[in-house]
Amino acid sequence: MESARLVGDYALGPRIGSGSFAVVWLAKHRSSGLEVAVKEIDKKLLSPKVRDNLLKEISILSTIDHPNIIRFYEAIETGDRIFLVLEYCSGGDLAGYINRHGKVPEAVAKHFMRQLALGLQVLQEKHFIHRDLKPQNLLLSSKEVTPLLKIGDFGFARSLTPESMAETFCGSPLYMAPEIIRNQKYDAKADLWSAGAILFQLVTGKPPFDGNNHIQLFHNIVRDTELKFPEDTRNEIHPDCVDLCRSLLRRNPIERLTFREFFNHMFLREPRQIPDVEHSGFSTCTGKSLLPSAQPSTSTNRFKSSAENVHKHGSSSSASNSQISMPHTSFEKTRKDTEGQCSSNQSGVVDSLELIEREYVLVNRPSASLEGSSDCFDTSLQDSGFPNILPRNEKVSSSSLEAQKPLSDVSGPRPASVSYLLTEVQRLTIVHPPTKLQLLHQYAQALTELASEMGNTGQVKESFAVTLVVLAVWRKALEICDSWMMSVGENEVNPDPTTAPETSIPDLNSPAPAKTWVTQEFVTALNQAENLSTQLNETSAATHMPDAMETIYERALAYGKSGGAEEYLSNKESAATLYKKAILLLSFIIEEAVTLSLNPSFSLTPDDKKRILYYISNLQHRRSHL
């Protein structure tokens, strides 16, 4: 009997796939017996472009360790071959699954889309776009009804900073975004279009667009008509699913859902549990990730760099130079310090607001309905100077929110209502850039005031760290202006940076004046950062820099505590102002900070998000009853 072919430590078995440039083999590790997929690539078939794509795939996969991304073990190079050793998925791909099952139940579609969203979240955090998302590239861990889904085949993927736009024509025609077909510049939202096409196919059994040939297919994708669901499925599909499909398959990428909105869409949400004040995990110290020590979700458990994994050549993605570099603390040290404090006295930054709630906020609190929380949140936005994001004649009805109530007899404010409303804010602002710009202005204004307070009290390093976040906020606003101008076809505006900033928000009915105003605000923040940097240099403050997000979080807690004290002393106006500041900063952390281009990147664990939503809900509840 002929012995198995050996590649490194792996014995190759049967062929399980093939393509234009590669053959895929099922293989086993000779020592551990681990089954893997080995992609064999003939170097002679590689053009320089294809070789570059291959190196990108190695580079991307070597930096990611996530259950919804295909796992990369190593690359082995011989004289005429390159072998990629990858995780083996016995369930085949999603295309085969759809061929076997046809349209799937909505629960199964929801399962797969949640898995896809989790994988895309990792790519988005790393500023990668896949560019070829399709059922054939979504692998399944087993042949179960609801297996684990993993994103694979990164040959077309590329690193993309939030400001940059790709121009390469690539991807599968059935799942290709209109902006790619039109040969326009595109960004990571092209992946969201593909995700929408995949969801549509899951729940209907067929892609959203077809044609007799590529020309007809492309015409059907780019023409401005409403997405149509097959007659036999219209009454079967939940409105949330229909909304997600339509929101992802918007031809104008500006109107398409953002990644944040996609991850938080109602269709993908898990059933929520209402925290119990006395028995919630928030009120105990478990030693798990807490906000000050929360690490970016992709910063730990990574595989070795490609320089270590590729035997003869390495490849690694260069860090983006477009990010705002943030001074930061040692997360590991902070985590240990925090854990050491928790077990004894429940003190420290993380638990301080919890103690505030017990002392000031949660005393004899009356029951609050979701509708009440909705009104409270809307009122807070108006009081803060926000635009009327939920107009009175379009306010979400109590009946539509009724489905969000897990329990009708639970007293106290509900975090679910705040999360729902914040998501509605995000969903509406994508269609209205002026509203989003004003929201960013509110965050920038609050952070600028915080930086000023700290600078006035001699906390120059903290002030500098927060000012860098302000710069990141205005940079995002500039990106929105650029995209807005592109969508309406306005010419580029190059405002004079020496022009004095506007003292108030201008009329934002068109992108040109909006960009002028945003640029002026950015320059103002940049000048402030330079002044603070000069102060630091003059004082030789080359010491450890504080973490900006911890600083913002701590100050939000302090505002909440002070507001509770003022409420206790019946100083209602002062209490309302302090509560409002705390709510705004906490809302910034949970809704906007995680989307900014910061270095190091900032992320929250699910527990952190729930905790902060709970704080926001309680603070809103107290403020509404002053």
Curated annotation (Swiss-Prot):
Any single Gene Ontology cellular-component annotation: cytoplasmic vesicle
MF annotations from Gene Ontology: ATP binding; protein serine/threonine kinase activity
Gene Ontology process terms (BP): autophagy; protein transport; regulation of autophagy
Keywords of this entry: ATP-binding, Autophagy, Cytoplasmic vesicle, Kinase, Nucleotide-binding, Phosphoprotein, Protein transport, Serine/threonine-protein kinase, Transferase, Transport
Segments carrying motif AIM (Atg8-family-interacting motif): 360-363
Oligomer status and interactors: Interacts with ATG13A. Interacts with ATG8E. Binds to ATG8E on autophagic vesicles.
Name of the featured protein: Serine/threonine-protein kinase ATG1a
